């Protein structure tokens, strides 16, 4: 039985590390928009999870029904958060196979 070629293994590990770093940078440079009520409330979130904008259509602002607006903002935030997680899984998932595991649960 022959020993594995350590230089080849090291080269593969370095290549995977470079791909992983590129995927991480792509995720961090990305932006997603979560929405609720067919876009009447939107939350823009960076790939790092930072909320960069919240837009609320005046049609959903009712001073007598603040709870609905709160629910819509929360729904838009959760939608944006899910989209960031989906983006991370899309970019990192194929790379995680090389590590023998699913990294999607990290995001």
From Swiss-Prot:
Keywords: Cytoplasm, DNA-binding
Subcellular location: Cytoplasm, Nucleoid
Superkingdom of the organism of origin: Bacteria
GO CC entries: bacterial nucleoid; cytosol
Gene Ontology molecular function: DNA binding
A Pfam match: YbaB_DNA_bd
Primary location class: cytoplasm
Disulfide bond residue pairs: none
Subunit comment: Homodimer.
Cross-referenced NCBIfam families: DNA_YbaB_EbfC
Protein task: Binds to DNA and alters its conformation. May be involved in regulation of gene expression, nucleoid organization and DNA protection.
Family annotation (PANTHER family): NUCLEOID-ASSOCIATED PROTEIN YBAB
Family: Belongs to the YbaB/EbfC family.
Name assigned to this protein: Nucleoid-associated protein CE0210
Protein source organism: Corynebacterium efficiens (strain DSM 44549 / YS-314 / AJ 12310 / JCM 11189 / NBRC 100395)
């Amino acid at each position: 039985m022959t020993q594995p070629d350590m230089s080849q293994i090291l080269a593969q590990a370095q290549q995977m590390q470079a791909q992983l770093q590129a995927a991480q940078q792509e995720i961090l440079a990305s932006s997603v928009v979560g929405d609720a009520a067919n876009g009447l409330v939107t939350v823009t979130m960076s790939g790092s999870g930072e909320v960069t904008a919240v837009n609320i259509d005046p049609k959903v602002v009712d001073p007598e029904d603040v709870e609905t607006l709160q629910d819509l903002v929360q729904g838009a935030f959760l939608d944006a958060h899910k989209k960031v997680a989906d983006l991370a899984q899309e970019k990192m998932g194929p790379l995680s196979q090389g590590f023998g595991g699913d990294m999607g649960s990290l995001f």
